[in-house]
Design a protein with these regions (language model features):
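Generic secretory/membrane-interface signal
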Residues: 1, 6, 26, 58-62, ...
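Short glycine/proline-enriched coil/turn segments at helix->beta-strand junctions
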Residues: 18-23, 51-57, 96-98
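Glycine-rich phosphate-binding loop and adjoining helix at the ATP-binding site
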Residues: 37-45, 58-59, 68-118
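Conserved active-site "lid/cap" helical segment
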Residues: 43-53
């Protein structure tokens, strides 16, 4: 299975193309914490565009803030003040026409450790 993993941080957005647990391609874009929601979303799309292929099946996103994974909403990111109640799952899913899953980055780390070990 091929999927895209994304880490939205306060200083960088990182994306990787992962196949069978191996990172085949990765890309990173610096984030200006003072940028608008729209600018950061555009940077996010640019980053994903560098790693996505027509074989990609899903996109997973880790966010360092308050997230409702079931609703797909990012309520707050401390290091990106412009992000308040962003319906991130819907935005990314509509842009790429793929299923998208988001969660707090610490939860993503814990799930990865449980599934794959350190």
């Amino acid at each position: 299975m091929e999927f895209i993993g994304v880490d939205i941080g306060g200083t960088n957005i990182k994306a990787g193309n992962v196949v069978d647990g191996k990172i085949l391609k990765k890309h990173s874009i610096a984030v200006n914490r003072e940028s608008s929601e729209e600018k950061i979303l555009n940077d996010l799309f640019l980053c994903i565009d560098q790693v996505i292929t027509n074989k990609s099946q899903k996109i997973g996103v880790g966010v360092p803030g308050i997230v409702d994974p079931s609703a797909g909403i990012v309520y707050d990111i401390q290091n990106i003040p412009s992000w308040k109640e962003v319906p991130l799952t819907e935005i990314i899913s509509q842009h790429y026409n793929l299923p998208v899953f988001i969660n707090n980055d610490a939860n993503c780390f814990a799930m990865g450790e449980k599934l794959f070990g350190i």
